């Protein structure tokens, strides 16, 4: 089972353009998303092990606040 972080270096419309990072746990996925935000990347969503959206872009931004 894996958690998926959908992200990109700059904003692209449509999921087909997004990059994907895979982690084994929720904590690792959140940590990866936080690191991407600190680098100035766009984090679109985090999906859980069932493929359901765990956090969308707005929720991720609210969760981490100003990541820099």
Show the residue positions of the predicted features:
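Short aromatic-glycine-(Arg/Gly/Cys) micro-motifs in beta-strand/loop hairpins
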Residues: 1-18, 47
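A short, charged, amphipathic alpha-helix used as a generic interaction element across diverse proteins
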Residues: 14, 23-48
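Surface-exposed loop/edge segments in extracytoplasmic proteins
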Residues: 13-20, 52-56
